[in-house]
């Protein structure tokens, strides 16, 4: 006879409602935790890696398509009339830049053999770059050198609101400084050299550059692992032939040899960004000399690129830089030839994630089918590239397909709602 005080053990029957509720709670909790920047920055790239790798298994990456030499006559039938405004080719409007006036007795001032500026304190949690955020993260370090108190997220929410956007351009970074930093000013120039970096450092100003970088993992089969990256330079040492840099991927106080930096820098037309307080502007003008003038600076960069193609005709980056500088001067036919040579020599897979001169040159030389092929490849590798979407849209517009063009322009705005070129494109197409 069972004792009435005996309470037999019974396995609880599974309640699917309870299981479902638990899963929902876990999912919500995971979602909330994912919003914490520290956790987000460490998980997002893994999710992005998994997604990219799987998608590339079914759609393998190809080399950049080589354009045709001749343009079919029918491609030139659909064109913009002379009274219409061509699509814009540059983002934010530059602010007025003081004119450089050379002095009759311009004698170079010797600089010391070593300069080490004191960088801002580096906080791993705050300063290590979030996914695809090296531009804002590096700029945040740069601004804090002058006492700014924000961080990379303050910058990215303005110029890169979508975390999946894999690139921030130098003009977007300077735009942020000019409009949101409070009191600081900013310029960027191209065709830099090691002496220019050293002279700016000797004047008490760090230098930010864009350079080539080898990532530590493959995102797809046969990934060449080449990417673009921003770097803050705060010192140099002639005796060791070495720069001191601060890298939001590798950490503070890194060192790189002069020749290695120049080699990595060439891939980006040796572009450099300068941030400075207004009271240092006259000193900076004297340091840059004729390169303070934007057009003169670009002409000098053009001559450097042309010389480097002659010295090393197999250097794809030299040809690409030549095309980029020719595009600036609207010499589109010659630019197209330079880009075609660069692509034939083989460029890195991610090259068009960061630089878009070929899109512009192809469009203006009526290589519309080639532009469609090029932007298709660019979007396969960088599916959130608003610049590739923009120029793919213009290619469809040139073919008379305004509906598809508008769809691409709107897609570009989904990635970056502040992308004025896409907004202007929509307005243009709807009014013409």
Annotate each language-model stretch with its function.
Residues 295-303, 330-338, 365-374, 400-408:
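Structural signature of tandem alpha-helical TPR/SEL1-like repeats
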Residues 46-114, 118, 341, 411:
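Ser/Thr-rich, Proline-interspersed low-complexity disordered segments
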């Amino acid at each position: 006879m069972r004792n009435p005080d005996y309470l037999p053990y019974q396995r609880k029957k599974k309640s699917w409602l309870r299981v479902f509720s638990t899963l929902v709670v876990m999912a919500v909790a995971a979602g909330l935790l994912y919003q914490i920047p520290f956790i987000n920055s460490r998980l997002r790239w893994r999710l992005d890696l998994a997604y990219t790798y799987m998608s590339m298994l079914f759609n393998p990456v190809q080399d950049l398509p080589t354009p045709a030499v001749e343009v079919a006559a029918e491609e030139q039938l659909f064109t913009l009339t002379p009274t219409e405004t061509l699509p814009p080719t540059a983002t934010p409007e530059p602010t007025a830049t003081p004119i450089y006036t050379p002095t009759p007795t311009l004698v170079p001032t010797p600089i010391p053999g070593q300069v080490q500026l004191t960088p801002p304190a580096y906080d791993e949690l705050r300063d290590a770059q979030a996914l695809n955020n090296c531009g804002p993260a590096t700029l945040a370090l740069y601004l804090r050198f002058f006492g700014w108190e924000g961080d990379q997220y303050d910058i990215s929410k303005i110029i890169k609101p979508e975390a999946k956007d894999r690139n921030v351009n130098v003009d977007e970074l300077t735009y942020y400084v000019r409009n949101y930093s409070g009191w600081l000013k900013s310029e960027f120039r191209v065709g830099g050299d090691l002496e220019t970096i050293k002279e700016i450092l000797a004047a008490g100003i760090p230098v930010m550059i864009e350079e080539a970088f080898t990532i530590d993992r493959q995102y797809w089969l046969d990934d060449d692992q080449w990417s673009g990256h921003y770097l803050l330079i705060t010192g140099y040492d002639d005796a060791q032939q070495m720069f001191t840099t601060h890298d939001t991927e590798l950490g503070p106080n890194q060192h790189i040899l002069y020749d290695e930096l120049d080699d990595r820098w060439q891939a980006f037309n040796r572009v450099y960004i300068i941030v400075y307080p207004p009271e240092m502007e006259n000193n900076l003008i004297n340091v840059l000399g004729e390169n303070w003038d934007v057009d003169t600076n670009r002409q000098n960069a053009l001559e450097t690129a042309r010389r480097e193609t002659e010295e090393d005709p197999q250097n794809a980056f030299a040809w690409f830089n030549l095309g980029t500088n020719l595009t600036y001067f609207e010499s589109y036919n010659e630019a197209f030839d330079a880009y075609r040579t660069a692509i034939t020599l083989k460029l890195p897979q991610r090259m068009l994630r960061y630089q878009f001169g070929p899109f512009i040159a192809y469009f203006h030389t009526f290589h519309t089918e080639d532009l469609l092929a090029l932007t298709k490849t660019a979007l396969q590798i960088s599916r959130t590239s608003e610049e590739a979407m923009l120029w793919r849209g213009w290619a469809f517009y040139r073919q008379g397909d305004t509906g598809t063009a508008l769809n691409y322009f709107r897609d570009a705005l989904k990635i970056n709602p502040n992308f004025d070129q896409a907004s202007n494109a929509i307005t243009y197409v709807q009014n013409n």
